[in-house]
């Protein structure tokens, strides 16, 4: 789920810069392939599983100097037999360089092979629409996102900040922070018997702090290790603590790490 709507501001603003250049008469379709590992799969502050391997394929096409259409398919699977968690996401988005900011709108379909919470608990699918705005504010990049989930009829708002520091010609350090907020019970409380969302409150979900180290291996390939720390808000404390109590791997406040490889062509 996270790779659909948690695009970093750096990526969005880079796309905007490219959009300002003159587009060719027939813009080609650009593809990217990614694969990675997460020690913990945490999405929007909620712990899902651990020891996850994931794969992503994306495609994008410039429709005009200022507009880009993109699609992607993302799959993640836990290698821990306690959760047996698997997820497939399919998404489409349209980004527009409005000058003052990069504006995006998208749709995502989520399929949960063994239930939203794994182990057969929870719904098997969800779908959402979202809008976001990305802009450089002073020394940092900022992205504001709001998404509405049709399955639970609740929304999620997020503010993300990131700053990149060049280390060498091929390596940079990216420091990022995110804060999420549930609007109307966005997966804030679950029925213990069915795993279905029964939350209704509007509360903070989490704060996420992350440091990543993108390393350019070539002009088209990048390797990125990262470390992160998730701090549960009121909308995540009970669920994440329950995963910890069940000895599944989740914690209220949790350190995790991972790495990914990405190639574009």
Where are these regions (language model features)?
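Residues on the lipid-exposed face of transmembrane beta-strands in outer-membrane beta-barrel proteins
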Residues: 35-37, 55-61, 90-96, 107, ...
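Short glycine/proline- and aromatic-enriched beta-strand/turn motifs that initiate or cap beta-hairpins
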Residues: 22-64, 68-79, 262
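Flexible, solvent-exposed coil segments and beta strand-coil junctions
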Residues: 34-38, 67-73, 135-143, 189-194
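Cleavable N-terminal export/targeting peptides
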Residues: 1-30, 66
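Short stretches within intrinsically disordered, low-complexity N-terminal or propeptide regions
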Residues: 16-19, 135, 223
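Outer-envelope beta-barrel architecture signal
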Residues: 25-33, 51-53, 65-69, 88, ...
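Mid-chain, structured segments of secreted extracytoplasmic proteins
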Residues: 74-106
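Outer-membrane beta-barrel translocator/channel fold
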Residues: 75-83, 106-129, 138, 145-156, ...
